[in-house]
Regions:
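Conserved short alpha-helix immediately C-terminal to the canonical SAM/SAH-binding motif I
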Residues: 117, 163-166
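Conserved active-site tyrosine of GNAT-family acetyltransferases
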Residues: 170
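GNAT-family acyltransferases
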Residues: 1-107, 122-152, 176-196
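Conserved hydrophobic beta-strand within the GNAT/NAT acetyltransferase core sheet
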Residues: 155-159
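Conserved G/P- and acidic residue-centered "switch" motifs that form tight phosphate/ATP-binding loops
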Residues: 79, 112, 163
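Conserved acetyl-CoA pyrophosphate-binding loop and the N-cap/start of the following alpha-helix
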Residues: 108, 112-121
Length: 196
């Protein structure tokens, strides 16, 4: 399944995308400055590369829903792979809501692509079929209603407070700031409650 926006195309990544995909992550600091996560350690990068290989070779990616982000050529066809994005933590093992993420090549920053991706991805994400379920989540994610037993579905985003670009992207997409992560005052948490 693929979808697109005005300047971008999004689709599941294929084995033929692997080399271009790893090139995005071999840049100086694509995760730290462009996405919604903190700088990964060497062991996290090694685990990521191994998981990525499994995804491309065996399609084994259960805890993520991700797509490649491609430029759209003037004729409307798929262009260069410039990053990936989606949601992770779908298994709720850390008692967190699924979190939105994106990573873009440094040379395409500050062109509105991250905002364009997040807005279009959210449109597709919220249109997917749902089932009622029970899960434990962090109280911080519930905002002022942390005492409630039930909550409407939402997406989260953990972002370094130094990452002003990602904060702007998330807020343009409608996410609201909830506070700082416990024990990590440099990391903020944003949430977006389902519009449905």
């Amino acid at each position: 399944m693929g979808f697109s926006s005005e300047r971008l195309m999004f689709r599941p990544l294929l084995a033929s995308d692997f080399t271009a995909y790893l090139a995005v992550y071999k840049q100086e600091a694509p995760l730290y400055d462009s996405g919604t996560s903190s700088r990964p350690s060497q062991s996290q990068l090694e685990t990521f590369v191994q998981g990525t290989r499994e995804y491309f070779i065996q399609r084994k990616l259960i805890h993520y829903a991700m797509v490649g982000i491609f430029l759209k050529k003037p004729d409307g066809t798929e262009g260069e792979l410039i990053g990936d994005g989606g949601v992770f933590l779908l298994d709720n093992r850390d008692e967190k809501w699924p979190e939105v993420y994106y990573v873009l090549k440094k040379e395409v920053w500050n062109k509105g692509y991250a905002t364009e991706f997040v807005k279009e991805f959210l449109r597709v994400w919220w249109s997917l079929p749902r089932e009622n379920t029970r899960m434990r989540v962090q109280a911080l994610s519930l905002g002022p209603f942390f005492y409630r037993q039930e909550a409407q579905e939402q997406l989260g985003a953990e972002i370094s407070m130094n990452n002003k670009g990602s904060i702007r992207v998330i807020e343009k997409a409608g996410f609201e700031f909830c506070g700082f992560l416990e024990g990590k005052p440099e990391m903020g948490y944003w949430r977006l409650v389902s519009p449905n």
